[in-house]
Amino acid sequence: MTPEQLKASILQRAMEGKLVPQNPNDEPASELLKRIKAEKEKLISEGKIKRDKKETEIFRGDDGKHYGKFADGSTQEIDVPYDIPDTWEWVRIKSIYWNFGQNKPEKSFRYIDTSSIDRKKNIINYKNLQYLSPEQAPSRARKLVSQNSVLFSTVRPYLKNIAVVRELKEYLIASTAFIVLDTLLNETYLKYYLLSDNFINRVNNKSTGTSYPAINDYNFNLLLIALAHDS
């Protein structure tokens, strides 16, 4: 087993809750999900984000299987990627994040493109970010980011251009090649979940195109994520 394979194996075991013993007294992930929902409601009431009218609730039936409950009240069995501890939850990824949309830059900014990501360390190369005026802004320079936003490149996702916005000393704008995820989840947990081979494989399966395969926001948002009690 190569070092990269070992790293991937350890990461996957962590995402399945198999690295450390699970404490039944830990707060269940359902409580974290409630706090996320409350925060989204707050942002909706403040007019900062829009309500998702097609929100899907996922629950575990008495038979141990997972089901999706849709806005119209109907339910459907859902295939989950793997088993997780009882205190964890499977949710659609759109349920755990929000973003503040897009805007055409009105003042000078630092531009985060996919080439701005150091893929070996999965960090943003802040020193190499272009400083651009509004007139110099590329057409893709539109995504608003916040402190601890997680960036996931939807173009050629197998390259794993994924990072967390750790510094917000200047006005930053990200490329529309990224999905920007703002959340109450631990941003490091989310980053590593998005980096896991299992998740990337699911993204690749939903991507279209040959030279530059990409996944659209709709299909990305329907992907499942395992919500840990301490995530």
Feature locations, PLM:
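Active-site-proximal structural scaffolding
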Residues: 3-4, 8, 12, 86-90, ...
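Sequence-specific dsDNA recognition surfaces
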Residues: 73-79, 94-104, 115-147, 165, ...
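Extended, domain-scale alpha-helical bundle/helix-rich regions
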Residues: 6-75
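Conserved structured core elements
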Residues: 4, 82, 87-90, 139-142, ...
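Short helix-capping and inter-helix turn/linker motifs at the boundaries of alpha-helical repeat units
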Residues: 1, 70, 211-215
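Non-catalytic DNA-recognition/assembly elements of restriction-modification systems
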Residues: 6-9, 13, 18, 75-106, ...
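A short beta-sheet element
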Residues: 140-143, 147-200, 204-219
